């Protein structure tokens, strides 16, 4: 049978055309499968409802398959196609991992941060899913099919030109259909409003050529940030064409450069600057101890299936000198934990593309640490998130961390924090970074304290990790409360760096629903817990939805530094009027923060 197929294909140019079809179809199939698992739709019914949408959608998936398939006519060897498939698999699987973890797609800047995974590669296990196996399976089947196809006898440059011209024509048609379709059926779409805000002419005519979509949003319109553009591009076109597109974006709108603000931009920033930025900083009225709790969400603080996983945090909440906000919306971007640190320390939100800690680590930013004569960050994982630079960019005086190549578990972290507060002079500011509850929650898998029948493994491991960290945080709280020098003069803040269950995990959601657990993986919050005997005299329980950007202004009020020139873009959560009457929307807070960081505003103005 195989020999008959080879004989048939050996005549004329049949082998080349068969290879082209096989290669192009396999690439096309991978792109469609990726789209399905990310967006859960393939828009088939639109063929008779909205034909332009159908052409736009499938055309975007077909273009990269045609483009790559065309090179079959230039190379006689078949080996390169296997390499191409393997590289495509790596790109697709890497994006699936990143999307499952962050609901974002890889960018050029995030690819440059791969070294940050050092010591945390096992976290990928938590985001592995069976669909990832489909891509290497298709590659394997393609390799088997190659055995049935004879070697191409000659190059076909004319066929190559025809296929390239077809892909270019399809690109123009697809872009045109995208514009016409969105204008006709989705005028309420924010991206569409910007696309159709003015007629395309002159330089904007490039919109109709490959990567014109990138050019328009990166250069002409600048109406949306990178993440919104990337999501739109992958959904409307293909994750395969997104690979070169993300590099094109980085060329058209490079990240990491210091930008110049227009007078209009400066007017937007000025309302958030109070007084002279060079003025003398106020003296804090209390010491400050902040624990950035890795991946802490709010729901585990309550009882789960009759078990109390976090008794020490609950004990803090029962104390009359505590504040608890249980609905704090995570606002991190590509920087993940580093973004959480940025928000909590400086009151600024992260930049749109890339991680602030990498691209703008040399910027000196305002923070409550500037107000303290003694301050330190304790980092349990050296080299993580460029901590050796941003610690001093956030105006802390000292960085404490283990030797390179070593990591501290949370018990060792808390021991270091206790040692610091026992020996440092006052007033002091200490910021500790927890890591033991990092995915894949191995701390809770190796030696679980609780075993609950039927609970999904990852959920149980997560809860046991939190229980471990809660137990050592109890040691820190006791160390403060039992120290006469610190007991009434120290504020303790505990909050999560970000939420962790961000995808649609049906198994976890079903278990939570059956057992009346107040959580959904698509709608989770991180908590804010503050213990301050000097400032808080009666329990404060905030049930309104708040934001991570509210942590900084709340702390500034509690430590008595309200007169500091920078109060952040959030509000004090203890002020109910401010919570319900915010000066700006979340989107505007992102934009203002982006301008401040990327212009190095506090050094230049």
Spans of model-derived segments:
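Transmembrane and membrane-interface helices of multi-pass
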Residues: 4-242
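Solvent-exposed soluble domains appended to multi-pass membrane proteins
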Residues: 263-605
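Short, flexible coil/linker elements and helix-boundary hinge sites characteristic
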Residues: 49-50, 149-150, 202, 237, ...
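Short coil/turn linker and secondary-structure boundary residues
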Residues: 108-115, 261-264, 546
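Membrane/wall-proximal cationic-aromatic binding patches
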Residues: 195-290, 297-315, 604
